[in-house]
Every structure is written in C-alpha cells, then in structure tokens.
C-alpha cells in the first residue's frame, strides 16, 4: 500500500494493541474503553493466551467501547492475521500501541531478536499500511541506555554504549528502526523504567527484578536478612503501572508528542538502600550494617536456599547498583497541567509490600509444600507473556 496518509474520518478512535492480555496491556485496554466509550479496540493475542484474553474481554464488557480479539503473533507476516483481518485493520485503525516484546533476561539472542526486532518491523509494516493512522505508540525501555552512567536524556539513543543482556541490545535495535520510521510516520516512543504494581492496591501479575529484593525481605524467616548487594546509593527507579497507563494515554493523544521520546520514570527516585530499609521496616526486619560487594552478592545468590532466583533474576538485581539518572523533561513538560504525575515511591511502597505479603500468605495456605518464597510468582502471561517462550513484555 502507499505510505500516503488519508485524512482520518471524524469518528472515535480505532485502536490496535499488541501485548494483550499482559500486565500493562490489559490495563491500557481497560483505560481506553473507559475513557473513550465509542472506541473500538483490536487486541492481538497469541493462540496460547486466547483463553485468558477471552476471560478478560468478558469482564470488560459494558465498560464503554468494544474490544475485539484477533489471534496472531507479531513475529509472523501480517502479524499472523488473515488477509481479510489485515485489510480491515489497514482501513480502520487510527492508533497503534506496540507493547509486545520479550523481556526475560536469560532469553536466547535469536529469540529476543525475532520477537523484539523482527516483530517491531512487522508492526511498522502495518503502520505504513494503515490509511488513517494518527499515531504509532512504541513501548521501548529506559534500559536501551545499556551500561551508560550519569544523566541520560530522552533524545539520546546511540551513544556508543555496551549492553548487559540481549533484552537491552534488541530493544535498542528495535528503537533504532522506530526512530528511522518516524521520518514518515506519526510516532511517539515511551521508555518506562521498571514497572511495579498499582499505586493504590499494590496489585501486580509478576514478581521479578527489584521485586525479588522485597520478596526476600518480606518472606525471609531470618530476623536479619541478606545484606543489600552493593552500596545501594544508586537510584532504584520504578513507576506504578497506573501512572504508566494514564501517562501513555494522555501523551498518545497530544499532538506535541509526535516525533518525541518520553522517559516514564520517577523524577525523584529513592536510593536502593532507602527502599530496602523501608521494606525492612514494614517487614519488622533489622538490616545488617554492612554491604555485600557485587561479587559476594552473586556468590550468595548461588546458595541452595536462594537458587530459585536463577541466573536471569540475579542479573536483574544488578540494576540496583547502576548509577543512571533518567532525565524526563519531555514527560514533565507535556503532562504539566494534566494532574498526571508519577507518585513518589514512599507514598505507595506500603501497598506493594502488603500485596506481596498477602500473595505469599495465600500461596502458603493453598499448598503446605511451598517453602520457598520465590516460588510465589504466577505463571507468566503474554504482554509480559509467554511460557514455552520466555515472558513477553509489558
């Protein structure tokens, strides 16, 4: 099809979203349906996640707009859709939200490349074919900055950085393709940091990365738990999922956001040590006065009692000692006056801890065999999705 955009008809938006029914994806869909009662949302769903998606779709009936599930996969030509389905999207879609990606740190490079880079290329093809496209919203990650230290600006991408894992590397290459496409497409890029549970309820579908610090503290039978890996002075930048959804929805409809990149981060993050101390206080634990070096922490993580962390999760804990400061000037500028602002972690940390504690308590009640606190994660879904494959993104 031609890349020439036709003028969008004066109707409610028609949305296409990848990464459903994952952690962020399902919340974004619900937000769209509530905020725009006349909207029609197409959600791309992998076959293995169709049942879960159908259950969620049934719960969302009556919330406002309409949700239509399309079975497919971003790695396939035309996203695995039939010719009729693909043509329907091309004729109707006004907004695309591309969330699906593999984020699991231990994923083989070929798999990560196929999903994160080739999958993004396929979504770009759809965007070029959409006759009424108003916006392609791409979910990247702050971690495309790799091993860079210091202040990192939103308009920076390729600064000669090295990458610590294939997730960072493949998301970097995917964003490069997105940025090149922005010359001819109305694109907005979002780079969230680590997304945690809802700031009001603490609810989250997955426990990974920084959450493992909290889980080890909350559920540890030891009065004095494991010391914090490293000195803990680096900022632990996390954002609640409800903030991410509201910010993305608002910015994706702001014409000033076209062609720009937005760090979805806490503008004033707490240090990793302070977060660890606050969680310890809530768990009635006394922290050791000494720190572990990164190497000593890695050795301790290999002990049998902690082996459930596994190599990918040990790698994730390395982020707590990474002194990167993500500037969010663009985000603050465009959200100014909207009432949407990332809440400080201190204001909702108690809810996150309480949710972890309650999930662990319920898990222990369901099975007396569960002795390992790190066994409490539910099976991964798809926008963080996948099981046979490693989890896919947001």
Give names to the regions the model predicted.
Residues 8-38:
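N-terminal Rossmann NAD(P)H-binding glycine-rich loop of SDR-like oxidoreductase domains
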Residues 14, 36-39, 327-394:
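Amphipathic terminal alpha-helices
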Residues 67-118, 128-130:
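NAD(P)H-binding glycine-rich loop region in Rossmannoid oxidoreductase-like domains
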Residues 97-99, 106-114, 118-166, 188:
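Conserved Rossmann-fold NAD(P)-dependent oxidoreductase catalytic core, especially the SDR/UDP-sugar
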Residues 108, 201, 210-243, 247-251:
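A conserved pocket-lining segment of Rossmann-fold NAD(P)-dependent short-chain dehydrogenase/reductase
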Residues 125, 149, 161-193, 198:
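Active-site Tyr-X1-5-Lys
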Residues 198-211, 251-262:
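Glycine/proline-rich active-site loop of Rossmann-fold NAD(P)-dependent oxidoreductases
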Residues 272-322, 342-345, 361-371:
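Terminal hydrophobic/aromatic helix or amphipathic segment near a protein terminus
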């Amino acid at each position: 099809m031609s890349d020439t955009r036709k003028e969008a008809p004066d109707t409610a938006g028609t949305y296409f979203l990848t990464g459903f029914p994952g952690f962020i994806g399902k919340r974004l869909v619900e937000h769209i349906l509530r905020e725009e009662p006349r909207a029609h949302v197409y959600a791309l769903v992998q076959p293995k996640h169709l049942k879960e998606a159908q259950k969620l779709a049934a719960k969302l009936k009556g919330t406002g707009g309409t949700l239509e599930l399309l079975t497919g996969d971003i790695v396939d030509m035309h996203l695995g859709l039939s010719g009729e389905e693909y043509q329907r999207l091309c004729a109707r879609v006004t907004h695309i939200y591309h969330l699906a990606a593999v984020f699991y740190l231990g994923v083989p490079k070929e798999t990560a490349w196929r999903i994160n880079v080739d999958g993004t290329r396929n979504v770009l093809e759809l965007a070029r074919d959409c006759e009424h496209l108003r916006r392609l919203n791409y979910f990247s990650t702050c971690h495309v900055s790799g091993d860079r230290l210091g202040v990192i600006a939103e308009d920076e991408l390729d600064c000669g950085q090295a990458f610590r894992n294939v997730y960072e590397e493949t998301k970097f290459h995917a964003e490069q393709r997105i940025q090149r496409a922005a010359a001819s497409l109305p694109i907005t890029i979002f780079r969230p940091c680590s997304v945690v549970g809802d700031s009001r309820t603490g609810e989250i579908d997955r426990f990974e990365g920084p959450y493992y610090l909290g889980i080890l503290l909350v559920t540890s039978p030891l009065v004095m738990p494991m010391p914090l890996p490293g000195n803990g002075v680096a900022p632990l930048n996390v954002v609640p999922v409800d903030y991410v959804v509201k910010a993305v929805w608002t910015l994706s409809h702001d014409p000033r956001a076209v062609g720009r990149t937005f760090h979805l981060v806490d503008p004033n993050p707490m240090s990793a040590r302070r977060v660890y101390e606050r969680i310890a206080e809530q768990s009635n634990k006394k922290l050791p006065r000494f720190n572990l070096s990164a190497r000593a922490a890695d050795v301790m993580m290999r002990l049998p009692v902690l082996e459930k962390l596994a190599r990918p999760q040990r790698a994730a804990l390395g982020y707590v000692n990474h002194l990167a400061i993500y500037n969010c000037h663009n985000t603050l500028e465009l959200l100014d006056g909207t009432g949407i602002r990332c809440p400080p972690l201190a204001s909702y940390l108690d809810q996150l801890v309480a949710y972890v504690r309650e999930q662990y308590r319920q898990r222990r009640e369901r099975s007396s065999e569960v002795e390992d606190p790190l066994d409490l994660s539910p099976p991964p879904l798809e926008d963080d999705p996948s099981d046979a494959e490693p989890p896919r993104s947001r």
